[in-house]
Amino acid sequence: MQRLVARAPAKVNLTLRILRRRPDGFHDLASIVAFAGACDVVTLESDAPLGLAVAGPSAAAAGPDADNLILRAADAFARHVPGARLGRFTLTKRLPVAAGIGGGSSDAAAALRLLAQINDIALDDPRLHAAAREVGADVPVCLDPQARIMEGIGERLSEPLGLAPLFAVLVNCRVPVPTADVFRTLGLRAGEDLAGLPHEAPMSTGRAAVMRHLVLHGNDLEPPAETVAPEITRVKAMLAQEPEVRLVRMSGSGATVFALTDDCRAAAQVARRVAAAEPGWWVRPTVLR
């Protein structure tokens, strides 16, 4: 029996452009995503009966174990890799739930990486990616957590962008925001496009160029998310008034907001002040890559 451990980092949408609502009801998007140091932790005891235990500060919010995406990922893996070795998972849940940072998807991807490892399957194996797509649209990009552009409903991924590290503060006001509610508030009809600038890759991967790019390309889900959860507006305003902050944006469908700073010391200072002012919020200084 082996005991293997994998990080499941928060996925942050640096940009998020909603292009259209497709006839099947899904939304085509384009997004630059990066991954944070803040993470959940997934452990696998190989060859034990398939199961899952959830612990950690966000365990209660994660919901019933049977509904967890980790078990769905294991089931999908077993379908695509007949006779695969499985095992018992433990999820240490640290990230907030329904927060716009892909926690559940990253957990599932970490579980798939561990299953691939004990079954000697490469990360680029088509069976692994097929299993990831079955579990959820955000799972494929989390399999190899590096900054990329994701398109379609999340299934089309660029090569790693090699972005310079971005120093950030992640803030979640502990208000769960269901993604379906945000898209419902966005209000696109089937077949309808959303007007806006074309989504483009940064011209350069250096920090200054990326920051200039992010100023021009925002998150189309911010307005509807702020309607669903007005507390997001207060988080953004609080971060925007901090002198070290260079850009404030919501990630995904919310409610997590990130603020970018010039260096890790500035991020830590902002995080300390916000956490002191709002001790009930989840606040983490981090590096996005």
Swiss-Prot record:
- Annotated pathway: Isoprenoid biosynthesis; isopentenyl diphosphate biosynthesis via DXP pathway; isopentenyl diphosphate from 1-deoxy-D-xylulose 5-phosphate: step 3/6
Binding residues for ATP, per the UniProt record? P96, V97, A98, A99, G100, I101, G102, G103, G104, S105, S106
Transferase listed as a keyword: yes
Molecular function as annotated in GO:
4-(cytidine 5'-diphospho)-2-C-methyl-D-erythritol kinase activity; ATP binding
Enzyme Commission number(s) of this protein:
2.7.1.148
Q: List the keywords (alphabetical).
A: ATP-binding, Isoprene biosynthesis, Kinase, Nucleotide-binding, Transferase
Q: For this protein, what reaction is catalysed?
A: 4-CDP-2-C-methyl-D-erythritol + ATP = 4-CDP-2-C-methyl-D-erythritol 2-phosphate + ADP + H(+)
Tell me the Gene Ontology biological-process terms attached to this UniProt entry: isopentenyl diphosphate biosynthetic process, methylerythritol 4-phosphate pathway; terpenoid biosynthetic process
List the InterPro entries hit by this protein, alphabetically: GHMP_kinase_C_dom, GHMP_kinase_C_sf, GHMP_kinase_N_dom, IspE, Ribosomal_Su5_D2-typ_SF, Ribsml_uS5_D2-typ_fold_subgr
Family, similarity comment = Belongs to the GHMP kinase family. IspE subfamily.
Its function, per the record, reads:
Catalyzes the phosphorylation of the position 2 hydroxy group of 4-diphosphocytidyl-2C-methyl-D-erythritol.
Q: What is this protein called?
A: 4-diphosphocytidyl-2-C-methyl-D-erythritol kinase
Instruction: Tell me the organism.
Output: Azorhizobium caulinodans (strain ATCC 43989 / DSM 5975 / JCM 20966 / LMG 6465 / NBRC 14845 / NCIMB 13405 / ORS 571)
Designated gene of the protein = ispE
